[in-house]
């Protein structure tokens, strides 16, 4: 299940950049399609993450923190794409997104079921 989770968030990250770029270039139809596919991947990420949490968490704070950071990351991804679609500024959101994404990945790598890089 870990591989499904990692694959889904990698694909979601790619889709965020594609949707963002398509909205920026004015290709609304293609952007809408990729945005809907991105939303499907949000659901997959949340479901696989919840399954990993229930299976391996032992109900400690690190796993709960990782889950919370993951949900915040998904929220920021969606906010980036929506604000670009509406033509609003996204500078601050990009900074917040990158910080939260890095924290989420680092915490995920630190946890026992992650890849043991650290």
Swiss-Prot record:
It holds the Pfam family DUF1516. GO terms for cellular component: plasma membrane. Keywords: Cell membrane, Membrane, Transmembrane, Transmembrane helix. The keyword Iron-sulfur does not apply. It is found in: Cell membrane. The keyword Cell membrane applies. The chain crosses the membrane at residues 4-24, 33-53, 62-82, 93-113. It is a multi-pass membrane protein. Belongs to the UPF0344 family. This is UPF0344 protein RBAM_010920. It comes from Bacillus velezensis (strain DSM 23117 / BGSC 10A6 / LMG 26770 / FZB42) (Bacillus amyloliquefaciens subsp. plantarum). The lineage of its organism: Bacteria, Bacillati, Bacillota, Bacilli, Bacillales.
């Amino acid at each position: 299940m870990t591989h499904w989770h990692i694959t889904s968030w990698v694909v979601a990250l790619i889709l965020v950049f594609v949707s963002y770029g398509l909205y920026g270039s004015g290709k609304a139809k293609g952007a809408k399609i990729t945005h809907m596919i991105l939303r499907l991947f949000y659901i997959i990420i949340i479901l696989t993450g919840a399954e990993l949490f229930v299976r391996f968490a032992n109900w400690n704070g690190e796993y709960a923190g990782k889950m919370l950071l993951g949900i915040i990351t998904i929220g920021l991804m969606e906010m980036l794409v929506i604000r670009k679609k509406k033509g609003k500024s996204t500078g601050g959101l990009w900074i917040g997104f990158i910080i939260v994404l890095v924290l989420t990945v680092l915490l995920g790598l630190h946890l026992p079921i992650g890849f043991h890089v650290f």
